[in-house]
Amino acid sequence: MKLSIITPYYNCLNYLQNLVKVLEPQLTNEVEWIIIDDGCHEQELDKIKATIIHLLNNSGCAGVPRNYGLDVAKGDYITFVDADDLVSKDFVSKIINKINLTTFDYCLMSWEKIDKSFYVDVTTGRPDWNCSVWGVIYNKNNLKNVRFNNKKFAEDYDFNQIALKGKEERILDYLYFYNSNENGLSANWKG
């Protein structure tokens, strides 16, 4: 297995259905999609062509379901896709192509906000300020002792402070589309 895609999920079925339409057709025998249901147990999830793991209780943070995904992932490389975001129609093929061309410890990909009000072009972006785990492909060997903390916010920033080490690669294409979901954890931060 070359790639594991890990998606933490909690009560955003409408968004997830849009992601399924784009991502599910891209899945191959080299790629697994793991969706971690963080305590909402929606029946619709079981119809998706992915490994679904149902957690009994809501953890209240994205780190716990992401850690479950890391624990069961079989891919040599791992990436995270939030359930309320979208990916390009060639998301998987571009990542697999990069994996086949070279080895790396992590790979950054360009992304933009769905409403196009903000973007990150990795030709100019610096990995030391990358505070999100989506938009990054990680070599699983480098994550053996790296896990998310249980904070409600900034857990991905803390994760990346440890994980973004070693040989870096970049995919210049815009493969990831971030959605600022008004009901999501980031939008409701009261820091």
Residue map of PLM features:
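Conserved nucleotide-sugar donor-binding catalytic segment
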Residues: 123-191
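Acidic helix N-cap motif at the loop->helix transition within catalytic regions
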Residues: 15-17, 41-49, 86, 90
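Short aromatic/hydrophobic "clamp" motif used to bind/position activated sugar donors
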Residues: 78
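Glycine-rich, basic loop-to-helix element that forms the pyrophosphate-binding segment
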Residues: 56-73
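A conserved acidic beta->alpha catalytic loop
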Residues: 35-45, 59, 82
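Conserved donor NDP-sugar-binding/catalytic core segment of glycosyltransferases
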Residues: 86, 90-119
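Short, well-formed alpha-helical segments that are part of the catalytic scaffolds
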Residues: 12-25
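Cell-envelope/extracellular polymer assembly enzymes that use nucleotide-activated donors
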Residues: 2-4, 32, 158
